[in-house]
Design a protein with these regions (language model features):
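Solvent-exposed, charged/polar functional surfaces in cytosolic regulatory/catalytic domains
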Residues: 14-21, 103-110, 146, 150
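Alpha-helical bundle segments that constitute or directly flank the non-heme di-iron/ferroxidase center
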Residues: 1-28, 54-61, 65
Length: 173
């Protein structure tokens, strides 16, 4: 499981590198055409806020309930409703990134402390049906990858639609 923990812990830095490529005045930009996006329809700031909310209100709760309850029924969250409720465009990206980093560290520390028997605990999760705790962790990694892909797609659209010619890597100051 060390590899999956390493993957989970790398996410905040991976996301931060992509976010750094978005000009500050374009953090809330959304394209007119979302065709082909691999993620939900979020701005760069929206992706970040969504990752934090899904970590804290989604997966952390799902993990705990799977451990503590007998075959709990886990709800899927409406990402767009969370965006409205939590006013994503008003959030400070530095604060949100710090909160996401902290939440992810907490998630991994909690998971690392579990006995090996915990990984087979089961829950019923939305359209996925029955899943194990191990499966929930894999779904979180999948969700991370979806949003990294969504950010790459958004950077592609920023370049194409606004003719920004953003570099593939931000030069180090």
């Amino acid at each position: 499981r060390m590899t999956i923990f390493t993957t989970l812990l790398a996410m905040p830095d991976q996301f931060e590198r992509l976010l750094a490529q978005v000009p500050a005045d374009q953090l809330d930009w959304e394209p007119a055409n979302w065709a082909g996006t691999p993620a939900e329809h979020f701005s760069a700031r929206g992706h970040l806020c969504h990752l934090l909310d899904i970590e804290t209100q989604g997966y952390q709760l799902r993990f705990r309930r799977t451990l503590e309850e007998s075959l709990p029924l886990l709800a899927s969250l409406d990402g767009y409703q969370l965006a409205r409720d939590n006013q994503y465009p008003l959030q400070d990206t530095a604060v949100q990134l710090d909160r996401f980093r902290t939440a992810r560290l907490q998630s991994v520390a909690w998971l690392k402390a579990l006995p090996s028997s915990a990984w087979a605990r089961r829950a019923r999760y939305g359209d996925y049906g029955e899943v194990t705790l191990d499966g929930l962790v894999r779904l979180l990694v999948s969700h991370d990858h979806q949003h990294l892909a969504g950010m790459q797609w958004l950077l592609m659209r920023l370049n194409a639609d606004l003719e920004l010619a953003l570099p593939l890597e931000r030069a180090k100051a």
